[in-house]
Amino acid sequence: MVSTQLRILRVFGLTSAEVTAILRQAQADGCTGLRLLERDGEFAVCVQASAPTQAMADEHCDKWAQKLAARFGDALYATGETSLAQAALDALLKKRRLLVATDETTGRLVGALLRPLKHSEAAFDFGTQTYADPVSARKIITPPGLLNRFPGDVVQAAAGRAQLALSVGQADYAVCYMPATVGQAPFVLLCDRRGAVACAVSPELTDAAIGNNLLDLVRRRALGLKNTAGTIQFRPGHEHPLLLVSRAGQPKPGDTSRF
């Protein structure tokens, strides 16, 4: 009787081509039974093994899961059925950090992913102390001095609002999504006491994919992990690098691939 085992690795922040290249190399190295699923930027890498005994199947799966995890690096956020939203929430709860959004649009994108999860209200204010409160919302504006110093710079403007949201909401992290404007691709941004990080995204992404990009910024920042390719870092009020759409920010078609 043949025994089987399955391991699932969850990955976010790499392109489909990058993930596929890693899996093809693993296949060339002797790993069989690989399958790749993708939805809203989240990849599920399935490693399945069959062997004469359960112990042998377990050993084979564990060996390749560990090797693939090392190759994926900080893009690996969980194993099994854990979503990126759950991984980001777990990081916030573990570090006892509070997240806020600068505006209703951003709050809706993040809130739609976090609301179904247990204890999410302990890590995200859902606007109660920020954009959903009329008094607080009036305080979260682009600082006039920033507008005068960086006229037309929507990245600086978003960072300025995020800084104010941090203060108003007494939070640890503030996130913002900005749709495309003249001369600037849409982007996601996170601000904390150390500064700001931002990453351009494709205008073709779904709401869930945008929310995932926001929450991946949160996960990586909370856990002290490396940022994805194309992410810029800067101090609000100071010059920042150009923000361009990286390959990881391009839309990825939902698909299933077997290797």
Q: How would you describe each model-predicted region?
A:
Residues 5-7, 43-45, 97, 173:
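Structural beta-strand/beta-sheet cores of well-ordered domains, especially the beta-sheet scaffolds
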Residues 6-9, 45-50, 203:
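Short, hydrophobic beta-strand segments
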Residues 11-14, 39, 49, 104, ...:
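Fold-independent oxyanion-binding glycine-rich loops
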Residues 39, 43-61:
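Terminal amphipathic helices with adjacent charged low-complexity linkers/tails
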Residues 56-249, 254-259:
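Short alpha-helical segments enriched in small residues
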